[in-house]
């Protein structure tokens, strides 16, 4: 296992649309393992592959309910609206108020290639949307109503 360096704002990979995973190989499994190690090392709740310099549609999340590993995630339903503060491991020292859906439903593959459906609200909903935005080259500061230094 390895801890990746987290890419910060200004890096091109954060602004690119990430490439879908066509086949779940041992390298994808290793990427998931190392991304989780990196997430925990950084005391984060979510991490997308572009944040570690890899343009793949891969996300790991742990909001305190155990790790979620998402390959090629897609938001299939949204409900309500919630305005709250967000931060990002790739934009240290900055927070911003971002409007997100209050609840989401996401489809993604797990590391075994099985389709899973994740329903989230609260922090999980916000984290799912934030990380999937990373896969589209979108950062929270692009959507923030206002930002401030921590």
Swiss-Prot record:
Keywords, ordered alphabetically: Hydrolase, Iron, Metal-binding, Protein biosynthesis
Function: Removes the formyl group from the N-terminal Met of newly synthesized proteins. Requires at least a dipeptide for an efficient rate of reaction. N-terminal L-methionine is a prerequisite for activity but the enzyme has broad specificity at other positions.
GO molecular function: metal ion binding; peptide deformylase activity
NCBIfam families (UniProt xref): pept_deformyl, PRK00150.1-3
GO biological process annotation, one example: translation
EC number(s) from the headed UniProt entry: 3.5.1.88
One Pfam entry name: Pep_deformylase
Residue sites binding Fe cation per the record: 88, 130, 134
Catalyzed chemical reaction(s): N-terminal N-formyl-L-methionyl-[peptide] + H2O = N-terminal L-methionyl-[peptide] + formate
Protein biosynthesis listed as a keyword: yes
UniProt-annotated catalytic positions: 131
Protein name in UniProt: Peptide deformylase
InterPro entries assigned to the protein according to its UniProt record, in alphabetical order: Peptide_deformylase (IPR023635), Peptide_deformylase_sf (IPR036821)
Co-factor binding comment: Binds 1 Fe(2+) ion.
HAMAP family: Pep_deformylase
Cofactor requirement: Fe(2+)
Family: Belongs to the polypeptide deformylase family.
């Amino acid at each position: 296992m390895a801890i990746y360096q987290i890419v910060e704002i200004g890096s091109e990979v954060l602004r690119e649309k990430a490439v879908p995973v066509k086949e779940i190989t041992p390298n994808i499994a290793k990427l998931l393992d190392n991304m989780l190690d990196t997430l925990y090392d950084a005391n984060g709740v979510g991490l997308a592959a572009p944040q570690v310099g890899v343009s793949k549609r891969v996300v790991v999340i742990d909001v305190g309910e155990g790790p979620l590993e998402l390959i090629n995630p897609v938001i299939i339903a949204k409900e309500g609206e919630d305005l709250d503060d967000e931060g990002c491991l790739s934009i240290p020292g900055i927070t911003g108020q971002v409007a997100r859906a209050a609840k989401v439903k996401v489809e993604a593959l797990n590391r075994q290639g099985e389709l899973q459906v994740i329903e989230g609200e609260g922090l999980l909903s916000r984290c799912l949307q934030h990380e999937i935005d990373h896969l589209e080259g979108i950062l929270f500061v692009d959507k923030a109503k206002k930002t401030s230094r921590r």
